[in-house]
A protein has these predicted regions:
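Compositionally biased, low-complexity repeat tracts
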Residues: 8, 17, 37, 52, ...
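Mixed-charge, Lys/Arg-enriched low-complexity segments
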Residues: 60-105
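N-terminal segment of the canonical double-stranded RNA-binding domain
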Residues: 1-45, 100-104
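Generic detection of short hydrophobic beta-strand segments and adjacent strand-loop junctions
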Residues: 17-19, 55-58, 97
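A short, exposed loop/beta-hairpin motif centered on an aromatic-Gly-Thr core
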Residues: 47-63
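Feature targets compositionally biased, intrinsically disordered low-complexity regions
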Residues: 11, 20, 40, 55, ...
């Protein structure tokens, strides 16, 4: 990973978020979400067992993570929430506020 400050970094991993909730088999899970800067903005990726889900590019990290959660919900994941755990190489010590996402009807 580059040691450039995030504001100067053109592409690559810029943040790691944590996503947790309940999978389609009704089991609790948590995984790391990798947020990358791309030429078009930000994209995110998460892997869960054999499933890999990626967002499209968005202008904000919040929109990117939200799309990723919505895609997981489309596969049957519920009670989802996320928070940032790393900004660049800096660990946020689990002090960031959780963002809860409403389940789909």
């Amino acid at each position: 990973m580059s040691t450039l400050p995030l504001m100067f970094k053109k592409e690559g991993l810029v943040e790691k978020h944590q996503v947790e909730g309940v999978d389609p088999s009704d089991r609790y899970f948590n995984r790391a979400v990798l947020v990358n800067r791309t030429t078009a903005g930000y994209s995110a990726k998460v892997m869960y067992e054999a499933l890999t889900v990626e967002s499209g590019s968005h202008s904000t990290i919040a929109a990117t993570v939200k799309e990723l959660v919505e895609k997981l919900q489309g596969f049957g994941f519920t009670r989802m929430r996320t928070r940032a755990n790393f900004k660049g190489m800096r660990y946020l010590a689990e002090k960031e506020t959780w963002i809860d996402y409403n389940d789909r009807p």
